[in-house]
């Protein structure tokens, strides 16, 4: 099953695509162009996640509780009340300015028998940077993992579109 969604959120378009979807899992990809150099895009991605991630897609309700740790075994983690935390994804590959690969299940997928691999690829392009986001998720649910493909695809497309707006204008796009 292939589906293509063109998502328009404030500033620009993101091509969001469900590459594969079936009972055992799904793969989604979002591609967009950002009008900034790859080094700047990468730096803002790594260090400013609290400025552009939608707080509605956090457990704490505050995107400033998110952080990306850029060392072996690092993570995309979130601080929770009372010294709590959640480790959304583990960083398994870091090629500064070029590529990040994470392993794990984000958000509500953590409570399911699911895991995934998420890649962020930063490529120099005419006028800036092409950002490809690919998330492959596998697992078991009685009614199939494919029911999660569309919501995950839409959530990721929203986040990277907000990121694009943040890099280009200094403010994340709102819905």
Sequence positions of predicted segments:
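Sec-dependent signal peptide recognition
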Residues: 1-7
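Hydrophobic ligand-binding cavity/cleft-lining segments
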Residues: 14-63
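Beta-strand/loop substructures that line and gate deep hydrophobic ligand-binding cavities in soluble
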Residues: 27, 107-154
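Hydrophobic/aromatic beta-strand elements that line small-molecule binding cavities or substrate pockets
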Residues: 30-32, 87-93, 116-124
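Hydrophobic pocket/interface hotspot
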Residues: 41-42, 76, 91, 102, ...
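Short beta-edge strand/loop motif at the mouth of beta-sheet-based domains
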Residues: 48-88
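Short, solvent-exposed secondary-structure boundary/capping segments
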Residues: 98-105
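Short, highly charged C-terminal tails/helix-capping segments
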Residues: 165-175
């Amino acid at each position: 099953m292939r589906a293509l969604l063109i998502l328009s959120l404030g500033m620009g378009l993101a091509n969001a695509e469900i590459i594969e979807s079936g009972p055992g899992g799904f793969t989604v990809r979002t591609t967009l162009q950002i009008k900034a150099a790859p080094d700047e895009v990468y730096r803002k991605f790594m260090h400013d996640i609290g400025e552009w991630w939608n707080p509605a897609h956090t457990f704490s309700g505050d995107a400033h509780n998110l952080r990306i740790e850029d060392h072996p075994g690092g993570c995309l983690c979130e601080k929770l009340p009372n010294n709590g935390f959640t480790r959304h994804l583990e960083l398994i590959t870091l090629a500064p300015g070029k590529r990040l690969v994470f392993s794990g299940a984000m958000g509500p997928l953590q409570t399911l028998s699911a895991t995934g691999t998420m890649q962020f690829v930063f490529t120099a392009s005419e006028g800036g940077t092409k950002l490809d986001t690919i998330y492959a998720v596998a697992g078991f649910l009685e009614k199939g993992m494919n029911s999660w493909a569309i919501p995950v695809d839409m959530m990721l497309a929203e986040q990277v579109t907000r990121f694009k707006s943040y890099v280009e204008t200094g403010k994340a796009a709102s819905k």
